[in-house]
Amino acid sequence: MTNSDDDLFSEKSTSSDTQQVQNILELEAKIPDILSSAGKCIEAIQLNNSLEDFRKYSKEFLETVEFISTGLRRQALELEKAEVPVVSLQPKKRYASTPLSNLIFDQSSKLM
């Protein structure tokens, strides 16, 4: 571990540091949920041919993505407060103007 890692996990670390680590661990724990929900969406279409199940699992998927996205934005804001160069935080992709949920439901309508 680096010196800053030692500081982060030492007894001297502030409650803010501890909270940031907990937030990151919580976000990391949600990543498998995204894959699980996406898999269930595919199964709902392929195996069950159930639009109701697809909607349920796609809602779970989108809620999990939103949770992670919000958490990552908060982490980025915390980094900005720590005077990290903003250039390193700029997204490299353009964001779609159409919400992801609309795209998913449009595609599911085409499949049904």
From Swiss-Prot:
Keywords: Cytoplasm, Nucleus. It comes from the Eukaryota. One of its GO terms (cellular component) is nucleus. One of its GO terms (molecular function) is transcription coactivator activity. Disulfide bonds: none annotated. Gene3D superfamilies: 1.10.287.3490. InterPro entries: Mediator_Med11. GO terms for biological process: positive regulation of transcription initiation by RNA polymerase II. It is found in: Cytoplasm; Nucleus. Pfam families: Med11. The keyword Iron does not apply. Component of the Mediator complex, a coactivator involved in the regulated transcription of nearly all RNA polymerase II-dependent genes. Mediator functions as a bridge to convey information from gene-specific regulatory proteins to the basal RNA polymerase II transcription machinery. Mediator is recruited to promoters by direct interactions with regulatory proteins and serves as a scaffold for the assembly of a functional pre-initiation complex (PIC) with RNA polymerase II and the general transcription factors. Component of the Mediator complex, which is composed of at least 21 subunits that form three structurally distinct submodules. The Mediator head module, the middle module, and the tail module. The head and the middle modules interact directly with RNA polymerase II, whereas the elongated tail module interacts with gene-specific regulatory proteins. Med11 is part of the head module. Forms a heterodimer with med22. The med11/22 heterodimer binds to and stabilizes the central head subunit med17. Belongs to the Mediator complex subunit 11 family. This is Mediator of RNA polymerase II transcription subunit 11. It comes from Schizosaccharomyces pombe (strain 972 / ATCC 24843) (Fission yeast).
